[in-house]
């Protein structure tokens, strides 16, 4: 699998997830077998102006090569300046977000709103490619709504502008994350362009990811919500790519090790930020607040998870989390396996 000059060891990537795909989570997913991982969405305006909060999104592991930064803005000129700033900070690949359905983002003309105008898409890609000097990818949706499905036209415009790959989430902006993703549209985009196509949408399990590849012919699959609380999905996919047996689900001890390592990594990540270097205790509290959603996801479908989640909103330190894990999921405890019925009832909707 290749994008520009970069060859990847597999075809299953961690998608750019706002508020999720930070350095610690990317590291865990890569450790499990993700062939590649994007950052979460970063404001091109903030990058261009060097704001402290925006720069915190650029924290990365040295082995992240290429370091791929996803940017968003409404104006091609701002996207270009943001891309140049990202490259100056170490990015080796830039992705333009043209898929975010959030009202605030679309209301500014960014995200999915930008993809309503294929000519603007082509211009934006061309300017970002020229400014950054690195491969450019774009993430798009099927269209704005059912009456304006334009993903093939937009993908062709991105290709004409110089994009090295196009990622398609097979839902419209109007759908948000509801309903069913159209894998047929992923296949249509794959058949319409020569550049690499990445499929996204309704990839909850390793079986889903493998089926998307078979049914659409896409070059790679972006795993998004399916990785939340389950980075082991990438271990299963790596085994499948190698023709190896499916590995067993994580044991309780392995699960707890990953959860608590994630906690420690998140705390370290925040303590590296300039605003918290002189206040490690506040950095830890902030990190734990950020991690609460991950704690909910890690326990989704597990017996005991309901009681764990009721208390997770009160934790403030890494030690609090460790005690909570031991109390509700004690070592050697039985019934740790995921209950499919519980998992379905607690499906991630956001």
Task: Give the label of every model feature segment.
Residues 115:
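Aromatic- and acidic-residue-enriched carbohydrate-binding clefts of CAZyme catalytic domains
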Residues 38, 68-70, 95, 137, ...:
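Conserved beta-strand positions in the central sheet of alpha/beta enzyme cores
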Residues 4, 8, 12-13, 18, ...:
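Alpha/beta catalytic cores of nucleotide-metabolism and tRNA/nucleoside-modifying enzymes
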Residues 1-12, 45-68, 100, 105-108, ...:
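N-terminal small/glycine-rich loop or linker at the start of catalytic domains
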Residues 17-19, 42-44, 72-74, 99-101, ...:
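Active-site beta-loop-alpha junctions enriched in small/polar residues
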Residues 2, 17-92:
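Glycine-rich, positively charged N-terminal anion/phosphate-binding segment
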Residues 31, 80-110, 118-197:
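Alpha/beta enzyme core
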């Amino acid at each position: 699998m290749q994008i520009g000059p970069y060859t990847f060891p597999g075809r299953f990537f961690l998608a750019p997830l706002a508020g999720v795909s930070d350095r610690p989570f990317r590291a865990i997913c890569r450790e499990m077998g993700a062939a590649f991982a994007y950052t979460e969405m970063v404001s091109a305006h903030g990058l261009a102006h060097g704001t402290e909060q925006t720069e915190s999104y650029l924290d990365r592991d040295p082995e992240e090569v290429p370091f791929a930064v996803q940017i968003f803005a409404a104006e091609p000129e701002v996207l270009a300046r943001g891309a140049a700033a990202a490259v100056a900070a170490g990015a080796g690949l830039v992705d333009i977000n043209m898929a975010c359905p959030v009202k605030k983002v679309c209301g500014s003309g960014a995200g999915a709103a930008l993809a309503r105008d294929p000519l603007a898409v082509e211009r934006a890609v061309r300017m970002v490619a020229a400014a950054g000097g690195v491969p450019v990818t774009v993430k798009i949706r099927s269209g704005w709504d059912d009456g304006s499905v334009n993903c093939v036209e937009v993908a062709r415009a991105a290709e004409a502008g110089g994009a090295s790959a196009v990622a398609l989430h097979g839902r419209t902006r109007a759908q948000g994350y509801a309903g069913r993703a159209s894998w047929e549209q992923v296949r249509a985009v794959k058949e319409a362009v020569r550049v690499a196509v990445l499929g996204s949408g309704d990839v909850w399990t390793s079986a889903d990811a493998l089926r998307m590849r078979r049914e659409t012919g896409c070059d790679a699959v972006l795993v998004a919500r399916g990785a939340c609380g389950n980075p082991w999905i990438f271990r299963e996919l790596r085994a499948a790519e190698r023709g190896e047996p499916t590995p067993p689900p994580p044991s309780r001890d392995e699960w707890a090790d990953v959860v608590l390592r994630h906690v420690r990594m998140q705390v370290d990540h925040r303590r590296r930020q300039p605003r918290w270097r002189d206040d490690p205790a506040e950095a830890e509290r902030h990190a734990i607040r950020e991690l609460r959603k991950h704690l909910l996801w890690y326990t989704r479908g597990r017996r005991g998870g309901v009681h764990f989640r009721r208390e997770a909103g009160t934790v403030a330190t890494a030690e609090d989390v460790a005690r909570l894990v031991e109390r509700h999921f004690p070592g050697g405890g039985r019934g740790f396996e995921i209950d499919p019925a519980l998992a379905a009832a607690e499906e991630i909707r956001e």
